[in-house]
Amino acid sequence: MKNLNEILLSEIEDFRALGNKFLSGEMSKMDFKGASGGMGVYAERSGKTFMVRFRMPAGIATLKDLKLIYDFANRYKVENIHITTRQAMQLHGLTLDEVCNIMKEGINKELYIRGSGGNYPRNVSASPLSGVEKNEVFNISPYALAVGQHFLNKIYTYKLPRKFKVAFSSNEKDESHVTATDLGFLAVIENGVQYFKVYLGGGMGNNSRLSIESGQLIKPEDILYHVEALTQLFINEGDYEIGRAHVWTPVTRRIS
């Protein structure tokens, strides 16, 4: 993680300079959003304060992570800690200097916000009771965590047409909505062997769409090969021009 941390730490002062340009009126809110989202930061309505979003792969937070977020909230007088629908956590009402301090301390303590917004692989979500749920097919948490780490390891390298969401569900209840996300993995058992069903090209929002089932069962130990291949498919074939609602259209037309 040393090399990753060094790279992420080196980005902070450039981000601070962008933030100061925004605060001084030299940069529009939309232009700032285009740059800040990938850093895990968004300007709030006042135009003077900011929100940060922490990556919590599979919705799992260690006691160390939670204590650090609690410490940030107390230190910077944040009244509410917001838990997102993708199992990340947010702090609001921060100054630019506070944001940069959180970035630096978080990186040094391996709590990251990089890539939690913008056109990047977002927080990997998973069934909330993975590992302890009575009716789960098998524990999907290790695989969701591995994918989250895979994305984080090269988070600063991505150039995507749109944000990229990955989800894991541990049974047919599909609590993580793998059938309506960019890339979804559903745990199944076939002939006594553990596999994942793979779903592609779904999404929620104003233009919701169900995913396409790939028709192939994959072995859990091969999960990163498939994640990397499908991420590259998204990069190479996704639509960079039409806009967010249709970014998967060129891909799904070819495979449906």
What kind of region is each of these model predictions?
Residues 1-70:
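Gly/Thr-rich phosphate-binding loop signature of adenosyl cofactor/nucleotide-binding cores
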Residues 2, 158-244:
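Mobile "lid/hinge" segments at catalytic clefts and subdomain interfaces of large enzymes
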Residues 23-27, 49-193, 225:
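Small-residue-enriched alpha-helical segments and adjacent helix-cap loops
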Residues 41-46, 77-83, 236-241:
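Short, flexible, solvent-exposed loop/turn segments with mixed acidic/basic and small polar residues
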Residues 111, 235-236, 252:
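Non-catalytic alpha-helical coupling and interface elements of nucleotide-dependent molecular machines
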Residues 153, 245-246:
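Intrinsic, low-complexity polybasic segments
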Residues 248-256:
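Positively charged, low-complexity/disordered segments
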